[in-house]
Curated annotation (Swiss-Prot):
Bridged cysteine pairs (disulfide): C143-C220
Entry comment on modification after translation: Phosphorylated. Differentially phosphorylated in basal and agonist-induced conditions. Agonist-mediated phosphorylation modulates receptor internalization. Phosphorylated by GRK2 in a agonist-dependent manner. Phosphorylation at Tyr-169 requires receptor activation, is dependent on non-receptor protein tyrosine kinase Src and results in a decrease in agonist efficacy by reducing G-protein coupling efficiency. Phosphorylated on tyrosine residues; the phosphorylation is involved in agonist-induced G-protein-independent receptor down-regulation. Ubiquitinated. A basal ubiquitination seems not to be related to degradation. Ubiquitination is increased upon formation of OPRM1:OPRD1 oligomers leading to proteasomal degradation; the ubiquitination is diminished by RTP4.
Stored InterPro entries: GPCR_Rhodpsn (IPR000276), GPCR_Rhodpsn_7TM (IPR017452), Mu_opioid_rcpt (IPR000105), Opioid_rcpt (IPR001418)
Parts of the chain on the Cytoplasmic side: 95-107, 167-186, 257-280, 340-401
Lipidation positions, renumbered (S-palmitoyl cysteine): C354
Job of this protein: Receptor for endogenous opioids such as beta-endorphin and endomorphin. Receptor for natural and synthetic opioids including morphine, heroin, DAMGO, fentanyl, etorphine, buprenorphin and methadone. Also activated by enkephalin peptides, such as Met-enkephalin or Met-enkephalin-Arg-Phe, with higher affinity for Met-enkephalin-Arg-Phe.
GO molecular function: beta-endorphin receptor activity; G protein-coupled receptor activity; G-protein alpha-subunit binding; G-protein beta-subunit binding; morphine receptor activity; neuropeptide binding; voltage-gated calcium channel activity
Pfam families recorded: 7tm_1 (PF00001)
Listed name of the protein: Mu-type opioid receptor
Record has Glycoprotein as a keyword: yes
């Protein structure tokens, strides 16, 4: 068991977030989104005071060129994830809102997933600044917002993927019931319910998050009641169970039943075209779920291991910790790429947005003209009456033959 989790060491390690060499801290849940608590941070007194300690403190991660290489690599990766994630997810939401044909039940769930991913990637600039400066300069309010957004993203994403898996199961295994259940309206209601469920952890985390001035820098972290080691590890275990184990079990059962159904029945709907679309959408959702699990499994496993045992702090441990966190965020920018490659409708809409053809421009112009006509019917009628009056006047004033 971690020494910081032992109540006998409470006198020497009263704060699990403290990077002091007196204790070996378990990274807090907020450290999943906050670089100020990661091993090897620039604000760590182990690094700042290495000269004073004579470089002999074995609890401090080794410094040197690997730390600089790690910092540059992390900043480059997070910049790419932020740009691609924001642009890609906003493009997904725009396409679903813009095109009527995209307003299906599955795409409504995809909209919810894109919204959660966009919110998560929007916090990366704040965390990058925090990592470079070694302190949190944005105040308590933004600290609460950034940490709560991370938890909202984690839970809303996995709840939405569970919903999409159940939705696919109903569409494949119970096609008759799917006609009444799988509607855009029901999908929107379920999305709202997913956000409400996520608030069960998102709101408490928002109240628990605060800024602390310690060792010459400001930390953005979660505060726990005493004994802190108990509540901190309890939160980690709850997150591991409800945001990973249970959802993965639900998804596995749904897709296991779907695979058995698809193998046993050659024709699902009586139409080859409908069956092809059904299998294509099911394959896309399966890939999205699989990528999510691959990206989030390492950080969940890592946090649980750190909560249970003491891991020696080495360069490899520091790099692997950063890599696990970066992998979790990378998932937020991968989904739009997956849609572009796996779904023909998304691919076509993305292409029209990026490279509009002449026919697309004409359709947009004609739609705009029709909209203006509907918005201003009196103006159109006035113009028609004026033209008619001019024609009558010309006929009346024309010279007789």
């Amino acid at each position: 068991m971690d020494s910081s989790a032992d109540p006998r060491n409470a006198s020497n390690c009263t704060d699990p977030f403290s990077p002091s060499s007196m204790c070996s801290p378990v990274p807090s849940p907020s450290s999943w989104v906050n670089f100020s608590h990661l091993e090897g941070n620039l604000s760590d007194p182990c690094i700042r005071n290495r000269t004073e300690l004579g470089g002999s403190d074995s609890l401090c991660p080794p410094t040197g060129s690997p730390s600089m290489v790690t910092a540059i690599t992390i900043m480059a990766l997070y910049s790419i994830v932020c740009v691609v994630g924001l642009f890609g997810n906003f493009l997904v939401m725009y396409v679903i809102v813009r095109y009527t044909k995209m307003k299906t039940a599955t795409n409504i769930y995809i909209f919810n997933l894109a919204l959660a991913d966009a919110l998560a990637t929007s916090t990366l600039p704040f965390q990058s600044v925090n990592y470079l400066m070694g302190t949190w300069p944005f105040g308590t309010i933004l600290c609460k917002i950034v940490i709560s957004i991370d938890y909202y993203n984690m839970f809303t994403s996995i709840f939405t993927l569970c919903t999409m898996s159940v939705d696919r199961y109903i569409a494949v295994c119970h096609p008759v019931k799917a006609l009444d259940f799988r509607t855009p309206r029901n999908a929107k209601i379920i999305n709202v319910c997913n956000w409400i469920l996520s608030s069960a952890i998102g709101l408490p985390v928002m109240f628990m998050a605060t800024t602390k001035y310690r060792n010459g820098s400001i930390d953005c972290a979660l505060t726990f009641s005493h004994p802190t080691w108990y509540w901190e590890n309890l939160l980690k275990i709850c997150v591991f169970i409800f945001a990973f184990i249970m959802p993965v079990l639900i998804i596995t059962v749904c897709y296991g039943l779907m695979i058995l159904r698809l193998k046993s029945v050659r024709m699902l709907s009586g139409s080859k075209e409908k069956d092809r679309n059904l299998r294509r959408i099911t394959r896309m959702v399966l890939v999205v779920v699989a990528v999510f699990i691959v990206c989030w499994t390492p950080i969940h496993i890592y946090v649980i291991i750190k909560a249970l045992i003491t891991i020696p702090e080495t360069t490899f441990q520091t790099v692997s910790w950063h890599f696990c966190i970066a992998l979790g965020y990378t998932n937020s920018c991968l989904n739009p790429v997956l849609y572009a490659f796996l779904d023909e409708n998304f691919k076509r809409c993305f292409r029209e947005f990026c490279i509009p053809t002449s026919s697309t421009i004409e359709q947009q112009n004609s739609a705009r003209i029709r909209q203006n006509t509907r918005d201003h019917p009196s103006t159109a009628n006035t113009v028609d009456r004026t033209n008619h009056q001019l024609e009558n006047l010309e006929a009346e004033t024309a010279p007789l033959p």
